[in-house]
Amino acid sequence: MVKYPSGSLAAFRKPVTTQKKMRTGKRSYTHKKGVNFSDRGMTLEQQINESNKYYLTEEIAVVHKKPTPIQIVKVDYPKRSKAVIREAYFRQASTTDYNGVYKGYYLDFEAKETKNKTNFPLKNFHEHQIFHLAECLKQQGICFTIIRFASLERYFVTPASFVINAWRKAEKSSMTLKEIESHSYEIKSGFRPTLPYLKAVDNFIADRKRE
């Protein structure tokens, strides 16, 4: 039996800081109407995973989803050479969803989605995720969140620095769609791979080089 956590988090009280403020590229790329990623019947995670398989096969990038840590509680040994897990708990993940290497750059990112049409709730980000992204930014990693507006069928690569700054503001409960449009890189439609997010990442990297 696998038991899911209650969702509670031990508070990280260590301040989330970066060595320097990073200006995000205020550029949004036109969304092509008539393209429906959701018609393919896949979740955002499935779309990213399928795209990552394509990138790996084509030797474009090596990006993997980090496994959720499991705490094993009870194990039976019906045979000497075979162990059966009878009870385990999903532990709280301590970092982000994905990481990898692309064109010599270290990538680290989250995948988030919402059914909202005008804003993205910041409560969808946990403190440990914000802390980890901030630490990776200190090492000059390419850090971001792939945000999906499910009702609008729109996808964005949103730089981590923008997300962190928004999350830190106590009075701010969400990022508006307009804010995300102006600070993010919209993912253009594609067939191979399913979600060609690295094209948006290319624009993100290019803007960072110009800063």
From Swiss-Prot:
InterPro entries: Resolv_RecU, Restrct_endonuc-II-like, tRNA_endonuc-like_dom_sf
Enzyme class at the top of the EC tree: hydrolase
Binding site for Mg(2+): 95, 97, 110, 129
EC number: 3.1.21.10
An example Gene Ontology molecular-function term: endonuclease activity
Cofactor binding note: Binds 1 Mg(2+) ion per subunit.
Catalytic activity: Endonucleolytic cleavage at a junction such as a reciprocal single-stranded crossover between two homologous DNA duplexes (Holliday junction)
Chain ranges passing through the membrane: none
Cofactor(s) needed: Mg(2+)
Official protein name in the record: Holliday junction resolvase RecU
Taxonomic source organism: Lactobacillus acidophilus (strain ATCC 700396 / NCK56 / N2 / NCFM)
Gene: recU
